[in-house]
Amino acid sequence: MVRGIQLLFIIVAAFQLSGPFLTAHNERQNQTYDMDRHVFEDGWSAILTPKASFSLPGYEARPYTVIRQEFPFHGLLGWPFVKLFGHERVVVRLISIAFALFSIEFVYLILQRWLNPGSGVIGAALWGLSPLVLQFGQVPMPDILCTAGMLGAFWFALKPNLPISSAWFLFAILAKLSVIFFGLPILTALLLARNCRTSGEFIRIAVLWGMAPLIGLLCWSSLEIRDPDTPWTVVKLVSTQNDGASLLGLKFYAFFAGSLSLYGLGILGMTGCVLALINKTVLKARPAILITLLISNILYVLVVIRRIPEPQYILPPLAWLVILATFGWNSLSGSPFNYGRRVAVTLLAGLHILVAVIFTMDLKASHVPSINDIENAGHLIPANSRVIVAYPFYGASPAIWLKQNTMAEHSVGELESNLPQLQKDGFDYILIMDVKSHSTGAHMSLSQLAKTASSLFHTGAGTDGQPAADLIDYTATNAPFRQFCDGRFKQLYATRYVVLYSLDPTLYK
């Protein structure tokens, strides 16, 4: 049965396998893909010093940004396949799909360790067919890799296999450091499985298990000394003063609940969690594991998700909640399954499938109404040019779509202030374009769930030729960016959602 779930996941993941990255959180997808492209073109130098083709404020003179956060696994693993077969976008997607399949397998195996095989299949289905997994398990982002690594490390800790568990956890934290909190329950599971009875044995196993992840992380971070100065490193990320979302306001909780509920657990998952808490079936697991899982998830939410409230960061806690939900459904296995219960479960399953389809469609809908126009504008720009983009995010997506170095400007005041220096730094073009405004996790709040459900009947919105209601409005003739650029610069290309200008210095007033 679990193979059938994996096959169904592959069928859904095959949707637009070779297309551009335009779906939910495409900015982050294109950032990872850009790093991978540099690996495919430059080889080991782009692995040791990962980079992307957009520039950041304060570093405008440099036509790229060094990103020493996650290790570029998509680039490293995909490199030989791209050299042999080409098809870069297909290859990087297939790598994510492979690790999503690993994660489904690990959820199944973990549950089978504690429950019956049928419960393992339920958990694998809840996880593998969750809208968040169907989306982020197909795109070139590191989140499915780190989640699969976390689950793999936990499974091999239960066996117990110290070297392989340690290796999977090293992979997980190199893919994304944020999952380091889950080392606590993984190590706890290993120590319990090894039946450590003395403090000396406890310390020895802990040191042996943690040595590879610690040394690997230190080696990766130490390579920063050979990099050009960049704000995007593991060390600077950890040390950055960012208070994150307020715990006193409702916005953070609305995002978290919206992401975990219908985008994550679904109807059956939420019901299972309630059943697990009511029937206390989760107590079948060792109390020490439960306590450390609770602590690590609380720390992860407070330290990671509160600071970066984006949907892909939901995947690790979602995996543990799916396991909790499966314990809940397993609690019904010993009781009579009468007609009324069968009807109720059937209705819940039907509603779960409907909701999963709706919210998966929302995540996989294009956020760019005019990718063809953007690419056509890119064809008018000579190779190795530098382009200013009027854009609400940091510029990773335009760098891929235009195949140029880009610098994002977020307001007319910012553009006017920075323009003289940007021209000196070699920026010769300005591109204005409209994209969906909710490319971050904000659209997953509870206030948007009903709107998303209604989009089932408007699936064409956001595709070429179809206006979307939530587009940023930069290209309208009365929009501030257009009013600033029209008459100052030579217009090279203009459509409803894309306008390209040449920065001829003689035209600038």
Task: Describe each PLM feature range.
Residues 132-145, 310:
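Short acidic/glycine- and proline-prone juxtamembrane loop motifs at membrane-interface regions
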Residues 91-115, 152:
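Transmembrane-helix motifs of polytopic, lipid-linked glycan transferases
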Residues 165, 367, 379-416, 423, ...:
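Short periplasmic/luminal acceptor-recognition loop of GT-C membrane glycosyltransferases, typified by
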Residues 1-8, 167, 210-214, 281-282, ...:
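Signature aromatic-anchored transmembrane alpha helix within multi-pass, membrane-resident enzymes
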Residues 193, 204-245, 258-269:
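Membrane-lumen/periplasm interface segments of specific transmembrane helices
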Residues 104-109, 125-126, 145-164, 168, ...:
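Specific aromatic-rich, kink-prone transmembrane helix
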Residues 13-18, 179-180, 328-331, 341-368, ...:
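Transmembrane alpha-helical segments
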Residues 191-192, 260-298:
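Hydrophobic, aromatic-rich transmembrane alpha-helices
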